Amino acid sequence: MLSDVKIKVRDLNLYYGNFQALKNISLDIYKNEVTALIGPSGCGKSTFLRTLNRMNDLIPGVRIEGSILFDGVDIYKENFDVVELRKRVGMVFQSPNPFPKSVYENVAYAPKIHGLKDKRKLDEIVEKSLRGAALWDEVKDRLHKPATGLSGGQQQRLCIARALAIEPEVLLMDEPTSALDPISTMRIEELIQELKKKYTIVIVTHNMQQAARISDRTAFFLNGELIEMDRTEVIFTKPRDRRTEDYITGRFG
């Protein structure tokens, strides 16, 4: 249904100087689904992910054409509030990157930046966010100890909690488990399945099995182009394009 489309991308082109990194991308991202972006290194999937919260704005020489509609509003229109966009679209990066602060201060950081000073409200947000990231029970007795003392998997869940603290509508994840061991990876994957009940999730992954396990839809990128996008089971069992089949069966990439 049209009303279920959270993000509508149309005719998106992105250039780094004279180099075209994304070529005429059009796709829909649906509410409360996990959309996986797959493809070999350098195919444009992470670049595309960063267009969804305008992170590419920070790179000198970037030029973007086309439109990205978030709930029907073009996020690239003139005078669009980028700060508000990044409040609605949280991001989790490849390697866990906790701030050199306590567990509590990591999660409370963004609400404070946005002007929240009430200690009781901050306490509520910290607990709610840590529970949302399935981390509360593991850290509730060490909230004021350095976040760097957590394991890698715990640090990544802390980064997810930090993203949840501003109550976003969309979560972008750029290979969130690539630096983690198998058990920590499994916990993050289970968490993603839980999170999609409340959030729309877009995840970049190099792991074909992971994309098959956790996503509802999969988009295959190659050389800056969107080759095809469909329900994940279709992409992995009956892809329309030979290049998609060659990639997911390991013939290249």
UniProtKB/Swiss-Prot annotation:
Mode of membrane association: Peripheral membrane protein
Transmembrane segments: none
Record's function text: Part of the ABC transporter complex PstSACB involved in phosphate import. Responsible for energy coupling to the transport system.
UniProt protein name: Phosphate import ATP-binding protein PstB
Annotated ranges, domain ABC transporter: 7-248
Source species taxonomy: Bacteria, Bacillati, Bacillota, Clostridia, Thermoanaerobacterales
KW Membrane (keyword) present: yes
EC number(s) from the headed UniProt entry: 7.3.2.1
Record's subcellular location: Cell membrane
